[in-house]
Amino acid sequence: IERVRTVLRKETPGFEPVDVRGLVGEALKHAGHLSEVVDVKTVFPDEEVLVKGDALELELVVVNFLKNAVRAVADLPSRSSIVVEVLCQNEIVEVSVLDEGPAVSDEVFGALGKLTKSVSKEGLGFGLFIASSIAEMHRGHLAFARRTPQGLKASLVLPRLRELNINNQEWKHEAGAFDSHR
């Protein structure tokens, strides 16, 4: 509860280097029994990918994406796939969950990431709003894209941590340096 309050107040907790591949692995473990419902494919770069942040909070964003993707494909007549991919482009890390669910309306698509009524009967409408707040606290954002012929791509976009100098506790990434919160 305190973590959620921190997120909603937009306070910055103590951040550490986070291995994104490990973070995705933990999210897959905590997202429930995905393999019973869908086929899950992961796409990771060969090199280590680090971001500066709170691993648990970032994991919550990915778990939210995974659960939303499973809900989107749960009622499809045939078994569906979800792809979890980590892409690095210079100073940016993008963690995405791609599903093959039905197309979403313009109204629903426009409301993604905002505080709104949930389209799911189990949901409260807070999930993506909280995920968006977490992304912003980590100097990132959420991005959504429709897939063709159907489906959705939900992405967490964060600055990439390139170099860590432990002696003076400075964190560096492609776009510059910023002090740690220790």
Model region roles, listed by residue range:
Residues 14-28:
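A conserved beta-strand-to-alpha-helix junction within the catalytic ATP-binding
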Residues 39-49:
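Conserved catalytic submotifs in the C-terminal HATPase_c
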Residues 79-91:
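Short beta-strand/loop element within the Bergerat-fold HATPase_c
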Residues 104-116, 171-172:
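Short conserved segment of the HATPase_c
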Residues 127, 131:
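Short alpha-helical Gxxx[C/S/T] motif in the catalytic ATP-binding
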Residues 135-136:
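Detector for a conserved hydrophobic position within an alpha-helical segment of the HATPase_c
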